[in-house]
Amino acid sequence: HPRVRRQRQMCIRDSITTKFVILQLNMSKFELTSEYKPTGDQPEAIEQLVDGLRRGDKAQVLLGVTGSGKTFTVANVIAEVNRPTLILSHNKTLASQLYEEMRGFFPNNAVEYYVSYYDYYQPEAYMPTTDTYIEKDLAINEDIDRLRLRAVSSLLSGRRDVVIVSSVSCIYGMGSPMALSENVILLKKGQIIERNELLRRLVQSLYTRNDLELQRGTFRVKGDTVDIAVAYNEIVLRIVFWDDEIESIEECDPMTMQRIAKFDEYQLYPANLFMTTQEQTNMAIKAIQDDLMKQIIFFEELGDSIKAQRIKERVEYDMEMIKELGHCSGIENYSRYFDGRNAGERPYCLLDFFPEDFLLVIDESHVSVPQISAMYGGDRARKTNLVEYGFRLPAAFDNRPLRFEEFEAMTDQVIYVSATPADYELEQSEGVVVEQVIRPTGLLDPEIEVRPSENQIDDLLYEIQQRIGSDERVLITTLTKRMAEELSEYLLNHEIPTAYIHSLSLIHI
């Protein structure tokens, strides 16, 4: 029931608040850093948006033309209201650009990046028309995985000066806030704790011991010294014991092991976003077995022994892997059992880690909103064949992105940012539209000319030569990546300095 889920969510957030009350006593404020001051339509737009948030408006639209400085306006609003903020973008490239810009505006605050950590992802699928089963295949980017962990760690810390720039990954399932917060390790100088107890807690937080090579998410032990390669940061945490007392806590450079900083108190966050215990695993296996028997009986009653045998073999193999190794391929399809959720209940996601008064900014909302609403349907359609043909249990349906109405229910106040807001945003804002038309640069929109496609390359060469003669530059857009490459080669053959760019290289992380 929605009310029960809401109460449960509040309890989770309350537990996080209680656990990290120490840091909340020292809440940081946003410090906006910029050599520019708001100009053009920006000052009025900032004032209107801030007034709307303080007035309690649930939705506002920032309608700004291209180049009017909408990102700078949003940064000023964030600094003014001083709330944890989620900025949602519809693709990784734009998210990375926003992340870089926000890091520049808030160098002293927690600006984080949360997108899919797959460099390559082929989802599991079954096509009944050709009887083709496609196994899941993927490649994980370790740097992005680290940034995702850091984003969640910043939220768990209880600090208020957090901006997270995310793609639609923020509506996909992850571990529960309760499980993650319970596995945070609080260390204090002078604390009495047995070394082996610390090692046990590290393993419980999914750090693994490796005394030979210290890699991200591992730890090593040398006498009274425990070195931990923190999973969410590029540092090594060194804990030195004197008998059963923590003598010192230091952050060290992972390459040189030179000390970077000393601490009297330190919070170490888990090495993975999906936490579980042996007790939860045992309960999950029992629940999986029960549902497996129901599904076998279901297929047998339909007279389909092939599907019954298929689901039996696949699930029993998965359970054996979970018992032996603690995981299996496609373990996410059993997430409901490990989380203790009921059938149909939404998964935990990044939004669960935010306080209730967080600010949501949806960039390019005319594209992002339809994308959010489409995620559930696409996921459901793919998994329907897997379940109906005996490749997965029905619980696979519950490893999913949020439905759009679930996403809406989890948000408090939203700013939709777009040059062309759609009907949905305008309806939600009930006419509260903040316009930003005058650019800080004073530049006007260029005059648009539509020319015939005949002899377009010759016409293009003529225009390029005109610009070169004026010591100016030219930007050409093409329909496809291949066209960009071929046109670039053609222009180079005509001795015109040219470079194509059709995807941004990974931002420096």
Feature-to-residue mapping (PLM):
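ASCE RecA-like P-loop NTPase motor cores
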Residues: 26-507
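Short, positively charged and aromatic/hydrophobic N-terminal segments
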Residues: 15-23
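Generic detector of low-complexity/intrinsically disordered segments
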Residues: 9, 25-26
